[in-house]
Regions:
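PLP-dependent class I/II
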Residues: 1-9, 14-19, 26-39, 45-61, ...
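Short, surface-exposed loop/turn segments at secondary-structure junctions
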Residues: 69-71, 297
Length: 411
């Protein structure tokens, strides 16, 4: 019998680059094993508890043996009806729960399976750069070619999107969008989606929008849904996850709504890949969507307090980062004295010298290499401690005087 060769290659895996975030994660764990107190802003993993009424519903329903069997790939009808009501209440949009809604095992699973179901080898997909990794590599895993569209300061993203469609050959089959953005926290207004839908119809391009941060918004701003655009469901679908709005990241539950053909495609491939998520989780999701939404406001308010402490502290250190109006992230441009290092080496330096762990922007795409991302997952006292560590690093590098705070040179 022939032995398995360790040199055997797997083409699909070979298309995936090394996961940059693993580098900083391993360094963080090594530092903690040495007894160092590392303040961790790296992963967007909510640190708060799931609201009690949702947990109680899960526990109650899980006691019923009739809920322990296989679920359905589309999700239980009651949850799909709750999703429909959620869209009506929030956005005044009618969603048919039978044909235009499907439950997913978190957005990440749904996005990956949708691309696997709809993309062929040789298809082109437009993706913002920088972007959440599954937006890029879901298409890569499916065998498609990714064309990056710069999502950077000083560049009109819609104009770049339109230019990419005109200049791509073969014509793009799909575009992946996500606003408010992870990692950049960039936001758009409804007018942007109106132009996107018109563009997609003109060039026959499918639109997939990831609305993960719909509720993590600040200062009175509201995140629009692409489904608010008349005719959007002709070309578009939208994902939402309960991970951030309800502190349910580990529960792995979300949904997709919109275009019937794409909903059917996702349902078809999920019928082969899974039997849906655990029924008690789905019933608990109904409790989340239809229960008192004060918990959602409280979660957003907590992130706002952390945002304010971090941005104020970094400004005091001379690091003039932008104040995000949504998401749970601060997208921080690397200060000029460190710019040549690139985001990975700068992240390593922050870890070593400031005891602060962040995500290097290069992990979200080449255009992210000028930035690092802070996730607002530490409490305010820990954030202040992180700022002190960063100030100490700047001071040691001669960028701050021992008594006075001086603004770092801008890039």
């Amino acid at each position: 019998m022939a032995e398995f060769s360790p040199e055997r290659r797997f083409t699909r895996i070979d298309r995936l680059p090394p996961y940059v975030f693993n580098i900083t994660a391993e360094l963080k764990m090594a530092a903690r094993r040495r007894g160092e107190d590392i303040i961790d802003f790296s992963m967007g993993n909510p640190d708060g508890p799931t609201p009690p009424h949702i947990v109680e519903k899960l526990c109650t329903v899980a006691q019923r043996p009739d809920t322990h069997g296989y679920s359905t790939s589309r999700g239980i009808p009651r949850l799909r009806r709750a999703i429909s009501r959620w869209y009506q209440d929030r956005y005044q949009v009618d969603i048919d729960p039978e044909s235009e809604a499907i439950v997913t095992i978190g957005s990440k699973e749904g996005l990956a399976h949708l691309m696997l179901a709809t993309l062929d080898h040789g298809d082109t997909v437009l993706v913002p750069n920088p972007s959440y990794p599954i937006h890029i590599y879901g298409a890569v895993i499916a065998g498609a070619q990714v064309r990056s569209v710069p999502l950077v300061e000083g560049v009109d993203f819609f104009n770049e999107l339109e230019r990419a469609i005109r200049e791509s050959y073969p014509k793009p089959k799909m575009m992946i969008l996500g606003f408010p953005s992870n990692p950049t926290a960039q936001c758009v207004e409804l007018e942007f989606f109106e132009k996107v839908v018109a563009l997609a119809k003109r060039y026959d391009v499918l639109v997939v929008h990831d609305l993960a941060y719909a509720d993590i918004v600040y200062d009175g701003w509201k995140a629009p849904s692409i489904m608010q655009v008349p005719g959007a469901r002709d070309v578009a679908v939208e994902f939402f996850t309960l991970s951030k709005s309800y502190n349910m990241a580990g529960w792995r539950i979300g949904f997709m709504v919109g275009n019937k053909t794409l909903v059917n495609a996702l349902a078809r491939i999920k019928s082969y890949h899974d039997y849906g998520t655990f029924t008690p989780l789905q019933v608990a999701a109904i409790a989340a969507l239809e229960g008192d939404q004060q918990c959602v406001q409280d979660i957003a308010a907590q992130y706002k307090r952390r945002r304010d402490v971090l941005v104020k502290g970094l400004h005091e250190a001379g690091w003039m980062v932008e104040m995000p109006k949504a998401s749970m992230y601060v997208w921080a441009k690397i200060p000029e004295p460190y710019a040549a290092m690139g985001s990975l080496e700068f992240a390593k330096k922050l870890l070593q010298d400031a005891k602060v762990c962040v995500s290097p922007g290069i992990g979200f795409g080449d255009y992210g290499d000028t930035h690092v991302r802070f996730a607002l997952i530490e409490n305010s006292d820990r954030i202040r401690q992180a700022v002190r560590g960063i100030k100490s690093m700047f001071r040691a590098d001669g960028l701050l005087s021992s008594k006075n705070v001086a603004e770092l040179p801008e890039t």
